Amino acid sequence: MAQDKFDVGGMTCAACQAHVDRAVSKLDGVESVAVNLLAGSMMVDYDPAQVSPDDICTAVDRAGYSASPISTGTDAVQSGSAQARSGAAHMESPTKKLEATASAMRTRLIISIIFLIPLFYIGMGHMLGWPLPSVFTDHTHSMTLALTEFVLLIPIVYVNDAYFINGFKSLVHGAPTMDALIAVGATASIAWSLYAMFIMADQLATGQVHEAMMTSMDNLYFESAGTILSLVTVGKYLETRSKSKTGGAIEALIDLAPKTATVVADDGTETVVDVDSILPGQVLRVRPGESIPVDGVVLEGASAVDESALTGESIPVEKTAGDTVNAATVNRTGSFTFRATRVGADTSLAKIIQLVEDANATKAPIARLADKVAGVFVPVVFVISAVTFAVWMALTGSVNEALTSAVAVLVISCPCALGLATPVAIMVGTGKGAEMGILFKSAEALENLRNVGTVVLDKTGTVTRGKPAVTDIVVATRADGSPAMSEKALLKLAAALERSSEHPLAEAIMAECEARGIVARMVEDFAAVPGRGVTAREGQNLIAAGNVRLMDEMGAKVPVGLAEQFAAEGKTPLFFAKNGELVGTIAVADEVKETSAAAIAALRKLGVDVRMLTGDNRVTAEAIARRVELTSEQVIADVLPADKERHVRELQDAGGKVAMVGDGINDSPALARADVGLAIGTGADIAKEGADVVLMRSDLMDVARAIELSRATIRNIKQDLFWALFYNGIGIPLAAGVFFPLTGWQLSPMFGAAAMSLSSVCVVTNALRLRTFKPSVAVK
C-alpha cells in the first residue's frame, strides 16, 4: 500500500469535503481517504497496482474540484549532485496561505460594503422611515428606484461571483454544497426582483403609476440579495482570519528555522551561507544567541542549549563534545562547532512539522457523524426550502411571503459549522501538543487517548532513568572489625575487573570510577562466568566480581540476607572477592525518575489504572513499585521482551482501552498492540515504530498531560458539534416559519445570512480556546 497527500482546491464546506471523500473512495484500490476541509488537503491510502495519483486527481476533478499531489521529495538534483534542501524553511506555511485568502476576502468585503450601504438605504428606507431623495419616493420614478438598486447590486454580485460559479457547478455535478444554497437563494431573490421590474414596466405603460410604486416597495429583493452575499462574505472573512490562528503552532515551528549558517572550512575560515546549501558532514559554528541551523554532533566547545521549542523543556541543556544538537534549538552561552548529520527534511524540526501536518490530515472517528450529516445536508435543505415555499403559497397565496421563507431556509442553513468542528479543534489540539513536546501522529490517537482506562508503564527508561547507577559502596569488615580494604581500593579493584565486561552493571561501575578519577589497572586471565560474574588475576591475586553463587564458589562468605536486603530496595548487589575473601559490595540500581511518583498520582486523579511491566524479578520490581506508590497487584514482573505484547493483549481482553508507554527500544510490538502507544523520551528520534504518540521529553508527567489535552480537545469538538446541530435544528424551522403561528414573526433572509455567517465564526472561536489549554500538571 502507498500513502500520498494531495492539495484539494474548491472546497468551501462540509458537503464539499463529503463529495471529495465519496468520489475518491469509489475508486478501485483505494483503501482509505481522509479529507481535511480546514487544510484543503487529502490523505489517501491506495494500492499503486490498481490506482495512480493521476487517477485520484481525475476523480476529484470530475467531482467539481481540483487536486494535485504534494511533493514529499527532500533533495533537489542540481548539476548531477544532490543538494539538500531545508525542509522546515521551505515548507509552505498554512497560516500564510489562509492570511492571503483572508486578504482577498477583505478586498471583496470592502467593495461589497461600499455598494451595499446605498443599496440597503434605498431599498429599506421607505420601510424604516429614512429620508430619501424625491427621485426615489415620487410615484412617477418607481423604475428609477428599481434600476438604481439593480445597478448597485451588480458590483456586489461581480466580486462575489465565486458563490455562483462554485454553487451552480456543484449542482451540475449532482453534489450541491453550501455555495449552492447561497447561489440559489440570492438568484431567487434577484430573479423575482427582475420579474417585478417587468411587471412595473407593464404597469407604468398602462398608466398604473401608484401600482408600480407599490410593486417596487413590496417585490424588489435586490437589497436582500446584496445583503446575503455581503454577510456571507463577512462570515467567511472572519472565519478565515480565525482559522489562520489555528495553525499558529506550526507557523511558530517553521519560523524557528534560521535562514543562514556559519560554515567552518578545513583551513579555519568561516563563511555565512544559506541554510539550504548545508550538506551532511560540514562543520558549522554557532555563537551565543544564535539558532542551530541543522542537526549535528558537537566537536569543540561547550554551551547551554535551549531545547524548549522542540521538547517543551524550559531548562537549557548543557552540551559538550560528543553531544547531539538539533535544528531550531537556541545556543544560550558559549560558542561551539559541530558536524552536520541531518539536514533539510531529515532534521528533527522538519520531521516534527511533517508529523503535526500529517496528524491534521487524518480524520478522527468522532468526525464520522458530521460526515454522514454533511453528505445529505444540502439536498435535504433544498427539499425543506421547496416544501416551505409550497406550504406558504398554499396557506397565504403570497409569493412574497413564500419566497421570503424559502430563501431564508436556504441561507440560514450552515453545513460549514459541522465541517469545521472537528478539523479546527484537531489542528489547535495537535499544535498545542507540539508546543508541549507531545506529538500525536494521528487524529485518531488524539481521540482514543481520552478513553484509556489502563496505562501500562514499561519500567526501564519510563518509570526509571534506564541507566543504572551506583547507589551503595560497602567495604566488608573482617572478623577483627577492621575493613578489608579502603573504599578507593575497592573501586580500583572493581575498575580492573569491570573494564572488560559488557554488562550494564559494569558500565555503571566504570562510570562511577571515571567520575572519581580512578584509572582501571590491567588484569590477566579475565573470564566471564555465565550467570555468575567475572574473574581475573592481578599479579598473584585471584579477584572476582559477581553474585552470591560466584562468591560461594570462590569461598568468600556473603553475610546472610545481605543480597535480599539490597533486592528489597530495588538494587542489584555486586560482590567482590580477593583470594577467597569478601572485600566489599557495590550496589547498582536503575534510579526512579524524579517525576514518576507524581505522574502516577496524576494518572490516578484522571481515573486511570496504572500497571508497571518489567523483566526484573518480583522482589526488585515491587521495590521500585513501592517508591512510586504502586501495589504488588499493579506490577507485572519477570516478563521477557517478547511477552510484553501478550500482557497488553490480556489487559485488553479483560475490558477497556489500554495505553502502553515505553521507550521504543524493545517494546515496539507492545506499543503497536495497545489502543494507544506512547513512546517516551525519544528526543530527536520522533519516528518510533508502533507509537501513536511521541513524548519528546523523558518525563512521565507528559502522559497525564497528553490524556488531559486529548480530553479537552474532544470535549471542544463535542461542544462545536452540539452547537452546529442545535443551530441548524432551531434555525431551519425558524426560517421556514414553523413558529409563525406562535410569534407572528417571519425571519428575513438577511438575518438568516447573518446567523449563518456567525455560526461558523463561533465554532472556530470556540476551538481557539484550546490555545490557552493548561494541564492540571503544569509543564516545566
Q: Can you annotate each of these PLM segments?
A:
Residues 1-146, 156, 243, 269-272, ...:
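Flexible metal-binding regulatory segments at protein termini and peripheral loops
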Residues 73, 200, 204, 209-211, ...:
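Juxtamembrane coupling segments of multi-pass membrane pumps/enzymes
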Residues 91-114, 166-189, 353-385, 402, ...:
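Soluble-to-membrane junctions at the N-terminal ends of transmembrane alpha-helices
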Residues 99-260, 372, 473, 744:
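Transmembrane helix-loop-helix hairpins at the membrane interface
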Residues 107, 329, 453-502, 510, ...:
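ATP-driven catalytic headpiece of P-type ATPases
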Residues 128-143, 172, 176, 191, ...:
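Membrane-embedded alpha-helical bundles of multi-pass transporters
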